[in-house]
From Swiss-Prot:
Its main location: secreted. The lineage of its organism: Eukaryota, Metazoa, Chordata, Craniata, Vertebrata. Pathway: Glycerolipid metabolism; triacylglycerol degradation; Glycolipid metabolism. Glycans are attached at residues 353, 428. It is a peripheral membrane protein. This is Pancreatic lipase-related protein 2. Its EC number is 3.1.1.26, 3.1.1.3. It is found in: Secreted; Zymogen granule membrane; Cell projection, Neuron projection. Coiled coil: none annotated. It comes from Homo sapiens (Human).
Length: 469
């Protein structure tokens, strides 16, 4: 079925195929699957390299604040730079209407420098990205070709290993990374897709979009996977990697308001008064990745068939082989390339560093009478103490047990005690006492269980402390 958003564009489609050639980058056609399809009815050719004006900005631990311009067509620029052959190289490619200089890609490089020695190359193709979306979709073919040309130059001119190359791309940048990887025969070590763009790519042939064959290892973070119509989702719901992560279900991110108008965030001063907008959900993917560099343990992805099953704790705790870390350290997962389209879910925090640690709480009640109300617990750990989390609301019956999963924004450490609180709902003329006889806390990461006991009962809104049994 023809996507509704393409109906108007279909009227502009042309029939006759055309081709344009750009020297060492090769030739580019407007034939299928690149154009003239249901998703891509408008037949367009990519702009020239001169018009796109792609720049490769090299940052290293030696020059974290000031980039060095390098290019594959002039190997001397690489040899004269701080590029180090004994380090990994991470390319970061921005998406539609965005830029790399003085923006999130260069900030991400700086975070990497805190944990590793690395060549960090930001790919700035702002001129090609600030076009009509359908034109920008075609322009990434040239940017991908230029990126592949530079990587090939590193290999042939300097003997650099393709397996040490990691290409990170956001939105259209994810498919740009795919084009580079495809041109290099899928031999680059890793590609990370940060909410790969959906329009013009969802369900399209592998040749035009990101897929697992584009690199030795492909990991993907989906944060805005609702349909473009009517939800204005800019990402893909399609699984396109070896590991596909769907934080918070992959559609609505905590801290991003659901009202369409209020979820719109402008880029670069609304592109100097002219350009378009991207959604908060779409941006979250690179924010999560960036945070994961310094907070590797706060983004564990749980293998699960669906987000609903994950929320119901049907995929808890992590299996014996462990859970992969979404983001920078996903490549540490032993089973990363054992299959394609491996699916993982997790919840994140609303703001700050977005980290989250998942626990399953089981509470057994004690007392003498049934009360209608709710119960809350707080964790007290060797690192920090958590806020109170609601575990259950409804009929509170003595000897009844209630189980709930919670997501804590930080690592509390070894849990030393828990505190229980209850409150009644509605009118109750008596002054009942209720307590928790046992609370079990299970860690999602390794399945460790902590058991706490008490024989006390307390009045409403009075904290009860439970210690190890």
């Amino acid at each position: 079925m023809l996507p509704p958003w393409t109906l108007g564009l279909l009227l502009l489609a042309t029939v006759r195929g055309k081709e344009v050639c750009y020297g060492q980058l090769g030739c580019f056609s407007d034939e299928k699957p690149w154009a003239g399809t249901l998703q891509r009815p408008v037949k367009l050719l990519p702009w020239s390299p001169e018009d796109i004006d792609t720049r490769f900005l090299l940052y290293t631990n030696e020059n974290p604040n000031n980039f060095q311009l390098i290019t594959g067509t002039e190997p001397d620029t690489i040899e004269a730079s701080n590029f180090q052959l004994d380090r990994k190289t991470r390319f970061i490619i921005h998406g539609f209407l965005d830029k790399a200089e003085d923006s999130w890609p260069s900030d991400m490089c700086k975070k990497m420098f805190e944990v590793e020695k690395v060549n960090c190359i930001c790919v700035d193709w702002r001129h090609g990205s600030r076009a009509m979306y359908t034109q920008a979709v075609q322009n990434i073919r040239v940017v991908g070709a230029e990126t592949a040309f530079l990587i090939q130059a590193l290999s042939t001119q300097l003997g650099y290993s393709l397996e040490d190359v990691h290409v990170i791309g956001h939105s259209l940048g994810a498919h740009t990374a795919a084009e580079a990887g495809r041109r290099l025969g899928g031999r680059v070590g890793r590609i990370t897709g940060l909410d790969p763009a959906g329009p013009c790519f969802q369900d399209e042939p592998e040749e035009v979009r990101l897929d697992p064959s584009d690199a030795v290892f492909v990991d993907v973070i989906h944060t805005d996977s609702s349909p473009i119509v009517p939800s204005l989702g800019f990402g893909m719901s399609q699984k396109v990697g070896h590991l596909d992560f769907f934080p918070n279900g992959g559609k609505e991110m905590p801290g991003c308001k659901k009202n369409v108008l209020s979820t719109i965030t402008d880029i670069d001063g609304i592109w100097e008064g002219i350009g378009g907008f991207v959604s908060c959900n779409h941006l979250r993917s690179f924010e999560y990745y960036s945070s994961s560099v310094l907070n590797p343990d706060g983004f564990l992805g749980y293998p699960c068939a669906s987000y609903d099953e994950f929320q119901e704790s049907k995929c808890f705790p992590c299996p014996a082989e462990g859970c992969p870390k979404m983001g920078h350290y996903a490549d540490q997962f032993k089973g990363k390339t054992s299959a394609v389209e491996q699916t993982f879910f997790l919840n994140t925090g609303e703001s700050g560093n977005f980290t989250s640690w998942r626990y399953k709480i089981s509470v057994t009640l004690s007392g003498k009478e049934k009360v209608n109300g709710y119960i809350r617990i707080a964790l007290y750990g060797s690192n920090e103490n958590s806020k109170q989390y609601e575990i259950f609301k409804g009929s509170l019956k003595p000897d009844a047990s209630h189980t709930c999963a919670i997501d804590v924004d930080f690592n509390v450490g070894k849990i030393q005690k828990v505190k229980f609180l209850w409150n009644k709902r509605g009118i109750n003329l008596s002054e009942p006492k209720l307590g928790a006889s046992q609370i079990t806390v299970q860690s999602g990461e390794d399945g460790t269980e902590y058991n706490f006991c008490s024989s006390d009962t307390v009045e409403e809104n009075v904290l009860q402390s439970l210690y190890p049994c």
